[in-house]
């Protein structure tokens, strides 16, 4: 059994496969996922697990050099934005339109669907390198 925090086999596999500049997305229960994008559904019920729980878990193992968030989170969900900023520290944020975020899911290695039920709780993580 693994000793690390990420024990979901699908998430662990995607993280292990990530290269520099590859992307992994995490989102709320309502985010549409394009056909062809690997969807890892960890939602159990409304709110479980939360977006922040899943983000915290993934950040424990994935080296992230940049994140992408929807512009709309600034006004529609400032509490979630504050929680994200607290987790990512000095990692640069690029704000994009939500419609662009949905299109960019086509390029993601995978999308992790959480049980989150708050608006614009979606993020694209751009992989960095550890050297």
From Swiss-Prot:
Species classification: Bacteria, Bacillati, Bacillota, Bacilli, Lactobacillales
Database matches in InterPro entries: D-ribose_pyranase, RbsD-like_sf, RbsD_FucU
Active site: 20
Gene Ontology CC: one annotated term: cytosol
Annotated catalysed reactions: beta-D-ribopyranose = beta-D-ribofuranose
The keyword Signal is assigned to this record: no
Molecular-function annotations in GO: D-ribose pyranase activity; intramolecular lyase activity; monosaccharide binding
Record flagged with keyword Nucleotide-binding: no
Keyword set, alphabetical order: Carbohydrate metabolism, Cytoplasm, Isomerase
Subunit structure: Homodecamer.
Domain of life: Bacteria
Pfam family, one: RbsD_FucU
GO annotation terms (biological process): D-ribose catabolic process
Purpose: Catalyzes the interconversion of beta-pyran and beta-furan forms of D-ribose.
Family in the record: Belongs to the RbsD / FucU family. RbsD subfamily.
EC numbers, comma separated: 5.4.99.62
Subcellular location(s) per record: Cytoplasm
Binding site for substrate: 28, 98, 120-122
Pathway(s) per entry: Carbohydrate metabolism; D-ribose degradation; D-ribose 5-phosphate from beta-D-ribopyranose: step 1/2
The organism of origin for this protein: Latilactobacillus sakei subsp. sakei (strain 23K)
Name recorded for this polypeptide: D-ribose pyranase
């Amino acid at each position: 059994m693994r000793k690390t925090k990420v024990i979901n086999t699908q998430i662990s596999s995607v993280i292990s496969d990530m290269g520099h500049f590859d992307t992994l997305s995490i989102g709320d229960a309502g985010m549409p996922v394009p056909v062809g994008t690997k969807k890892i559904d960890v939602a159990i019920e409304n709110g479980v697990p939360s977006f922040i729980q899943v983000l915290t878990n993934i950040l424990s193992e994935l080296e992230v050099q940049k994140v992408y968030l929807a512009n709309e989170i600034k006004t529609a969900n400032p509490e979630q934005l504050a929680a994200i900023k607290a987790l990512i520290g000095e990692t640069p944020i690029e704000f994009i339109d939500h419609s662009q975020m949905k299109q960019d899911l086509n390029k993601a290695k995978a999308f992790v669907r959480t049980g989150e039920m708050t608006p614009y709780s979606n993020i694209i993580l751009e992989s960095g390198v550890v050297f």
